[in-house]
């Protein structure tokens, strides 16, 4: 098995890619690898490898993916709640990857489990990275419960998984919300949610809890034909080679002291207004971009000035887990760029 020694150059690459962050407490925990009172990022990655297999050079979760490149056309409305330059009126380069959950990059598509990770390049060398999912809420409120839920589900024992849900009301409530949410079988038509809460900091210093959504603008490609094991990705590749996919980025400000920031399983009231802050345009990524995207850690705690992490413990857990996944694959022969749509 080919491996690479983790030298100083690669360590600096880890830092540049966001595997090592220094965003307050979240950065400290990511550096240390701690996820909870007893867990570490290694605990989660070991679980993914043990239950889903180890695929050299790939992410340990969300391994199957397609890279995209594009831009964010900000309309300036987001400046109402955040001083982040991404919300000032203008255009910013974006790269990202559509993926599905799982350690196996060759798993057949099921029409569910879509995710979208993005990196916005901003003035002054700042970046905003976000890793979203086509689900309304997260599966567990704490790292410990998340680990227990994953252990039960990935064990393949349906009775064990059912017992865990039955014994953990927070996970059970989240599962009901996820199952009841509208489903889209294609990447192009799915709605992607931030899952966690963040803090928007305004120019006046006002601090507002926020969540966000990326929603299709209604003109993206329709439901694909379910032909072959990669039908979701082949349809996506065909769509972006034939044109661009367009989405709207919506910020949802919360009410401080009323809307929960610490628990990603809890939805906010449906009547909370949203702010349309601009248009996300995604298209085909050339090979050089695909290679960089493959090697990027889409750590959701990599944030620009004007956006901060909240008290949600899942955020720091995600940072540590993503960092450990990055460290392991950085020592390995890089995976090939995604081959989907080569004949499209």
Where are these regions (language model features)?
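Active-site-adjacent core segments of small-molecule enzymes
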Residues: 2-344
């Amino acid at each position: 098995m080919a491996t690479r020694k983790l030298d100083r150059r690669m360590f600096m690459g880890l830092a540049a890619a966001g595997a090592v962050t220094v965003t307050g407490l979240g950065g400290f925990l990511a550096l240390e690898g701690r996820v909870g009172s007893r867990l570490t990022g290694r605990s989660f990655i070991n679980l993914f490898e043990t239950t889903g297999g180890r695929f050299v050079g790939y992410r340990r979760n969300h391994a199957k993916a397609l890279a995209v490149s594009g831009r964010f056309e900000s309309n300036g409305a987001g400046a109402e709640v955040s001083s982040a330059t991404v919300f000032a009126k203008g255009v910013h380069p974006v790269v990202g990857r559509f993926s599905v959950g799982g350690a196996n990059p060759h798993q057949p598509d099921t029409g569910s489990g879509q995710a979208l990770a993005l990196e916005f390049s901003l003035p002054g060398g700042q970046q905003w990275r976000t890793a979203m999912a086509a689900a309304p809420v997260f599966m567990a409120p704490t790292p410990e419960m998340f680990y227990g839920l994953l252990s039960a589900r990935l064990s393949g024992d349906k009775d064990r998984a059912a017992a865990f849900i039955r014994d953990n009301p927070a996970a059970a409530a989240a599962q009901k919300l996820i199952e009841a949410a509208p489903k889209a079988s294609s990447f192009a038509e799915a709605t992607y949610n931030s899952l966690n809460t963040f803090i928007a900091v305004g120019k006046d210093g006002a601090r507002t809890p926020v969540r966000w959504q990326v929603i299709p603008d209604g003109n993206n490609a329709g439901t694909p034909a379910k032909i072959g094991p990669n039908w979701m990705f082949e349809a996506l590749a065909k769509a972006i080679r034939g044109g661009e996919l367009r989405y709207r980025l919506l910020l949802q400000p919360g009410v401080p002291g009323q809307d929960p920031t610490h628990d990603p399983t809890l939805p906010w009231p449906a009547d909370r207004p949203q702010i349309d802050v601009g248009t996300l345009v995604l298209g085909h990524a050339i090979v050089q971009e695909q290679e960089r995207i493959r090697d990027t850690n889409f750590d959701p705690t990599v944030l620009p000035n004007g956006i901060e992490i909240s008290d949600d413990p899942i955020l720091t857990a995600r940072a540590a887990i993503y960092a450990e996944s990055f460290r392991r694959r950085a020592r390995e022969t890089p995976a090939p760029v995604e081959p989907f749509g080569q004949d499209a």
